[in-house]
């Protein structure tokens, strides 16, 4: 039995897109990209005029981030990326609750590349996780890489192993910007 329809999956993909880009982490990534570009341009001995033209000034990341959130085409493209992943709803049957954070959607790369990050939602082999409640987590996989998950698209699975819950909790802590949330206040995985 499916936990949601194809139409609901599309609607939730749009919601996930907003959740993914609304965070302070997105602003930090924008600033980091600009800083890396500036470093490369300086190493290439490019003029300050060109560097100023193609890199962000302090505070520009807020405006760019706001424009990203309002860019319907960008949201649609990102929603399509989420939609094309294989979605599984994990039901936590353990005594340990899922954490969430101020940056609730995390990624786990399963393909290694020495030159580029493979943790984007479009990356080959990516696993995306989104704790929805203390007992529910949406896990999304690149189905072309994780072929074994294809029959489980839009299905439930029971999570009976505390190790699985703790691993997602560790990743939620790692992924957070400033705040981690736990229903019962138990943040033992943080230690």
Show which residues each predicted segment covers.
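Alpha-helical structural context detector biased toward long hydrophobic helices
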Residues: 1-191
């Amino acid at each position: 039995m499916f936990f949601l329809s194809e139409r609901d999956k599309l609607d939730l993909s749009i919601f996930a897109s907003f959740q993914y880009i609304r965070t302070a982490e997105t602003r930090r990534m924008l600033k980091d990209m600009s800083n890396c570009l500036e470093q490369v341009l300086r190493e290439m001995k490019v003029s300050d005029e060109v560097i100023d033209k193609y890199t962000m000034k302090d505070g520009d990341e807020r405006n760019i981030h706001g424009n990203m959130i309002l860019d319907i085409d960008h949201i649609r493209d990102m929603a399509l990326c989420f939609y094309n992943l294989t979605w599984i709803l994990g039901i936590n049957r353990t005594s340990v609750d899922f954490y969430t954070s101020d940056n609730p959607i995390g990624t786990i790369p399963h393909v290694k590349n020495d030159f580029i990050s493979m943790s984007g939602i479009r990356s080959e082999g990516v696993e995306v996780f989104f704790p929805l409640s203390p007992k529910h987590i949406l896990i999304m996989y690149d189905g072309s890489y994780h072929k074994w998950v294809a029959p489980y698209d839009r299905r439930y699975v029971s999570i009976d192993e505390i190790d699985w819950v703790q691993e997602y909790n560790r990743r939620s802590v790692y992924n957070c910007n400033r705040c981690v949330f736990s229903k019962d206040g138990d943040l033992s995985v943080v230690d």
